[in-house]
Amino acid sequence: MGLPWYRVHTVVLNDPGRLLSVHIMHTALVAGWAGSMALYELAVFDPSDPVLDPMWRQGMFVIPFMTRLGITNSWGGWNITGGTITNPGLWSYEGVAAAHIVFSGLCFLAAIWHWVYWDLEIFCDERTGKPSLDLPKIFGIHLFLSGVACFGFGAFHVTGLYGPGIWVSDPYGLTGKVQPVNPAWGVEGFDPFVPGGIASHHIAAGTLGILAGLFHLSVRPPQRLYKGLRMGNIETVLSSSIAAVFFAAFVVAGTMWYGSATTPIELFGPTRYQWDQGYFQQEIYRRVSAGLAENQSLSEAWAKIPEKLAFYDYIGNNPAKGGLFRAGSMDNGDGIAVGWLGHPVFRNKEGRELFVRRMPTFFETFPVVLVDGDGIVRADVPFRRAESKYSVEQVGVTVEFYGGELNGVSYSDPATVKKYARRAQLGEIFELDRATLKSDGVFRSSPRGWFTFGHASFALLFFFGHIWHGSRTLFRDVFAGIDPDLDAQVEFGAFQKLGDPTTKRQAV
């Protein structure tokens, strides 16, 4: 036929059998990728330290999605929370991967069958004997079936009525586990961080989809609307389908980047806004203050801070710190976290406590500045010693650690104090192993960043695809170059060939 690469899809334009075939093949490719990617990730994933080396630090992409839907066990005998198990059951990580690969193979065979046996009786219009599809009816069927699936997911899987529930955690990502969720039917259901909204919204949306599907199955569109929206043209279906996909992609890019109950930080890592707002730092200080109020010593109060909470309060876990084109996991950047050194408290020779000003998200370098409780600069690491007034040496800054591996250790040597002041710019201080993976010390983004970038980019691309194909189907007569003053009107939705003498003509 000699079609250019950007026109090859015209071969399925008037061929419902092969149109179905290529869509089944697409499903085979998607499911096959998902299953294969899951097996690859399971081959390289290290489940031994869920606190300091969780899935998102290791760059896992599909494991978090399986986990949030209730999969926590592996046939390898480990659990995602760090425990060991003896009976993982069929629906383990490997079981889900295998199911996707088997499904992919079946779809592959079905696609071949439908490509070979394309001229089926079901696709023929008995009035004309030509291939045709009742698109409004097909729309109703798909809407009804997707409504059933949506309702079933919300009413059974999420609620635990028939299924495991979903991943639910506290606001600071410390106690996450898979559990059933009750639907939230009040105003709280509209809070994106309330898991109950996931159940109630799926039940409500599924019910609406079922009713809308039944409506479109039982009510035919008016003729003027049918013609006005080109409902007989398959490119109309393509355009509106692309619209649904790009809208969904924009929505999930937002819920991933800004955070929600559907994107727990234990599975995808913290958001950049939690660093920007000092979210974890405030909670840590609140817990320490509560400990001091109970007559604990500073050392005891800091020792009770969970290592997991301290690790979230580290800039290396901020997804906005990794460049878009820095390939690899977070562990390939700053290294594998081994342990929390503790919280450094800086003091000048007068005994005044000083706080290191933290590095903002979009800075690669930042001056080391130490301020007191009132925000007044008391010490720094100067760029030019000759003009220095507040250098660590001049002010006599010391550092003492509370909690962590260096609990109770203090340093007064200026070089050591400056080293820890620089590291305190990046949040809580951790020992990082860069040797194992030959990590280069340059921050990487988390799967939260990759997912957002990918979905926002494709959503924009698909938005233009929607405009393109929508314009083609709505203004097809204009693009085909038909004289607007033509006395007879060609019905393009039903007849493809221009200039065909057998094409029916209808007076305007």
Curated annotation (Swiss-Prot):
GO BP terms: photosynthetic electron transport in photosystem II
Molecular function terms, GO-annotated: chlorophyll binding; electron transporter, transferring electrons within the cyclic electron transport pathway of photosynthesis activity
HAMAP family, per the entry: PSII_PsbB_CP47
Subunit annotation: PSII is composed of 1 copy each of membrane proteins PsbA, PsbB, PsbC, PsbD, PsbE, PsbF, PsbH, PsbI, PsbJ, PsbK, PsbL, PsbM, PsbT, PsbX, PsbY, PsbZ, Psb30/Ycf12, at least 3 peripheral proteins of the oxygen-evolving complex and a large number of cofactors. It forms dimeric complexes.
Name of the featured protein: Photosystem II CP47 reaction center protein
Key words, A-Z: Chlorophyll, Chloroplast, Chromophore, Membrane, Photosynthesis, Photosystem II, Plastid, Thylakoid, Transmembrane, Transmembrane helix
Membrane topology: Multi-pass membrane protein
Residue intervals passing through the bilayer: 21-36, 101-115, 140-156, 203-218, 237-252, 457-472
Higher taxonomy: Eukaryota, Viridiplantae, Streptophyta, Embryophyta, Tracheophyta
Predominant subcellular localization, coarse grouping: plastid
Entry note: cofactor: Binds multiple chlorophylls. PSII binds additional chlorophylls, carotenoids and specific lipids.
Organism: Capsella bursa-pastoris (Shepherd's purse)
Family note: Belongs to the PsbB/PsbC family. PsbB subfamily.
Highest taxon in the source lineage: Eukaryota
GO CC entries: chloroplast thylakoid membrane; photosystem II
